[in-house]
């Protein structure tokens, strides 16, 4: 028992926030997180929750796609090694040559301070400047890393501070690098079948009125398709119904605020856009 207590005392809870690693021409913060998770699975760490995909203010004019940031929470005995490696991932994979401004935040503690939660709540509906984010990092002595203008720090801080009062799940499938930028080939009938079979446990999969598949993005990013649903079981089941000939790199399930309506808790004021 004595050795077990010492082991637990040496464990560190590490919250990791990542944002703005992508550009309109490529990359995706969730794909980078998928790569990081694959690395972490080979380390002596424990995941404390599902990877979290949090979508913030949808009205941000400079957002790339869904304005989503990612949080990972782990328990580790070697936080320094983990932080160094994740920083390398962000520096190497971010599409900075095409305008990405990645931000990365680390917070070591089981309890997230109220200041993080407040920052995150504002990010759901307000425009928060990178200057405010850098000031927050400085005033709270937060470990961080950024490239470009540092806009990604806003989402990274907000991801760490986000509190789930409701959640859904999102299963994202990723393409192999050789397929990036190529047309996505997916069976429309299988997506129709998936929706009719799994709805309402899954949602936003197929637009019946306009006869349009909703689960596939249209840009050159690594995502092949994404299924949103109420439970882990429902999104995994749905993915087994979707048919495609393309060989995929893999998939990851995120805990998400998609479809929860938490962006609607505040009315956007015109003055906030000035």
Regions from the PLM with identified roles:
Residues 16, 68-76, 103-109:
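Short cationic amphipathic helices and targeting signals
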Residues 10-55, 64:
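N-terminal ordered "arm"
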Residues 270-274:
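OB-fold and OB-like beta-barrel modules that bind single-stranded nucleic acids
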